[in-house]
A protein has these predicted regions:
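Basic, low-complexity intrinsically disordered segments
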Residues: 1-180
Length: 180
């Protein structure tokens, strides 16, 4: 659960980075690296130090549309995380990257098609409400960025950043991988 919390924090920061730079993505790649475990008898690989370690878990998440919404990104990536992670192994490394990144203004005019389902009441799906919710979230992300730029990265935190095992506060104080 601590690993899942850290993944959520990293995704939230990734979404904020996308908003800050005016970018959107439709694909996230999640890689989980495990610590060496002598008790593990599954698939192994050799690391750069020539040690046998459990093979890392990797998942590619294709989003329905280009987005920088942390809610949409977190929801989809956590689903994939639950599928690929081996809960019996200790996680040593988490890599998250956004692929297929475009500038936001290039995708504004894109038309998204949704596959219809015979069992869904399509009259209840209101795309206007969904679009307003995404716009509201983007405005909140922009306001968060302004506060962080003015008062520091730890000036505004989410509740998950205060939970036990959360690492955002410590990561915000690190510069280039070293404590400031």
């Amino acid at each position: 659960e601590k690993t899942k919390l850290i993944v959520k924090e990293m995704l939230d920061l990734l979404a904020l980075d996308l908003v800050e730079k005016g970018l959107v993505t439709n694909q996230i790649v999640l890689t989980i690296g495990y610590d060496k475990d002598n008790e593990y008898h599954g698939e192994m690989m050799i690391d750069r130090y020539n040690r046998k370690i459990p093979k890392h878990a990797r998942g590619t998440i294709n989003l329905e549309r280009y987005t920088s919404s942390s809610k949409l990104i977190i929801k989809e990536v956590i689903k994939k995380f639950d599928e690929i992670v081996n809960r019996n192994l200790m996680v040593k490394r988490i890599n998250i990257s956004a692929s297929n990144v475009l500038y936001e203004d290039k995708v504004k005019d894109m038309i998204y098609h949704r596959q219809l389902n015979l069992f869904t009441n399509h009259q209840n799906i209101n795309q206007k409400d969904e679009k307003e919710a995404l716009e509201k979230e983007k405005n909140l992300q922009k306001a968060t960025l302004k506060i962080k730029q003015k008062y520091g990265k730890n000036a505004i935190l989410k509740g998950m950043n205060l939970e036990e095992g959360a690492t955002t506060r410590e990561r915000n104080e690190i510069i280039g991988g070293h404590k400031a």
